């Protein structure tokens, strides 16, 4: 996969030549239509991969084989990044979504069918050349992406980097509600933390709540040792996948906050925790997203981070994070 995306010149710079500034801006606002129109009929590899992974459009197996000549469509399926679909599903996906976007989130038990792929379909590092049963399919079947995958460019003091980052598909790509364990891609808060983080060389760095692993990828450019933790097994799997795809050495551990690194210390800790404060009135209700809700009342998650970080920091170490905190109505904020 890495060799193919490099050969395809599917980079941020190339993406900006394929799609106009206006269409890219619309895409940031969850509007695919301008980009869909501009890429309609384009056959070069970067355009095919953009339609497939970023816009969420089905593609024919033959088109994916041409875009990824080494891995091929069968290899994508073997890695858990794509699935074969029938003509009916492809036709419905090719129809433009309604202006209203995805349907309203329903109670968990009523929307299991609509949720994103679960752990059984996480991306894998399995060798796509391994033999596997080949079902009888049509000559050139349709395929759909199971994950968002897109290029990301980083200009850092140590040099420029071009990465490809996988995350869960968003509502705009699927037309379906997000699953509770949805792993977010690179959003505005993520970019804010990336920009504010000190990029001096350090011996060790820790990313708490790693999500798709983009903070850890940045840390790996200026830290000799990087550990990434997350309570979500799905987030850990995606971080491991992205580290392998981008040839980064990251020690990924599943667990809550600092529990996976108990007894260890670091020079730099970064965290973009689920800092949205969930009102008590909806606490415990179905449909709370893990990446937004940390599972603790009020701002107790942020309190836990601030109290737990010092024990994991070397002398002179740094903690950089984003946070919200609650100001009770009966307390003077000053």
Which role fits each region the language model picked out?
Residues 1-100, 121, 130-152, 161-163:
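N-terminal accessory segments
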Residues 89-100, 135-205, 210-222:
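SAM-dependent Rossmann-like transferase core, predominantly class I methyltransferases
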Residues 177-189, 199-201, 231-334:
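S-adenosylmethionine
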Residues 225-230:
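Conserved SAM-binding motif I beta-strand of class I
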Residues 101-118, 122-134:
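A cross-taxon signal for low-complexity, glycine/charged-rich
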Residues 3-29, 33, 75-78, 83-86, ...:
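S-adenosylmethionine-dependent methyltransferases
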């Amino acid at each position: 996969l890495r060799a193919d995306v490099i050969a395809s010149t599917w980079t941020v710079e190339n993406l900006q030549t394929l799609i106009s500034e206006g269409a890219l801006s619309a895409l940031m606002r969850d509007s695919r239509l301008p980009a869909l129109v501009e890429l309609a009929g384009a056959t070069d590899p970067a355009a095919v991969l953009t339609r497939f992974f970023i816009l969420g459009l089905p593609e024919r197996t033959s088109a994916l084989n041409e875009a990824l000549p080494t891995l091929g469509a069968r290899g994508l399926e073997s890695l858990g990044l794509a699935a074969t679909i029938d003509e009916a599903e492809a036709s419905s996906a090719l129809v433009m979504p309604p202006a209203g976007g995805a349907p309203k989130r329903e109670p968990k038990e009523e929307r299991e069918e609509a949720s994103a792929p679960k752990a059984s379909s996480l991306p894998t590092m399995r060798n796509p050349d391994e033999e596997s049963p080949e079902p009888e399919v049509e000559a050139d079947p349709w395929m759909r992406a199971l994950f968002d995958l897109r290029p990301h460019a980083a200009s850092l003091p140590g040099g420029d980097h071009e990465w490809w980052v996988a995350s869960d598909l968003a509502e705009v790509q699927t037309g379906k509600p997000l699953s509770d364990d949805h792993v977010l891609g690179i959003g505005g808060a993520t970019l804010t933390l990336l920009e504010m983080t000190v990029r001096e060389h350090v011996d060790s760095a820790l990313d708490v709540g790693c999500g798709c692993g983009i903070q850890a990828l940045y840390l790996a450019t200026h830290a000799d040792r990087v550990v990434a933790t997350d309570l979500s097994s799905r987030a850990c799997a995606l971080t491991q996948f992205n580290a392998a795809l981008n040839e980064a050495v990251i020690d990924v551990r599943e667990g809550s906050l600092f529990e996976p690194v108990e007894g260890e210390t670091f020079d730099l800790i970064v965290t973009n925790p689920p800092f949205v404060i969930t009102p008590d009135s909806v606490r415990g209700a179905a449909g709370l997203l893990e990446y937004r809700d940390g599972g603790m009342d009020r701002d107790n998650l942020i309190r836990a981070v601030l109290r737990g970080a010092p024990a994991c920091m070397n002398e002179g170490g740094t903690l950089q994070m984003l946070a919200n905190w609650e100001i009770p109505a009966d307390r003077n904020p000053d």
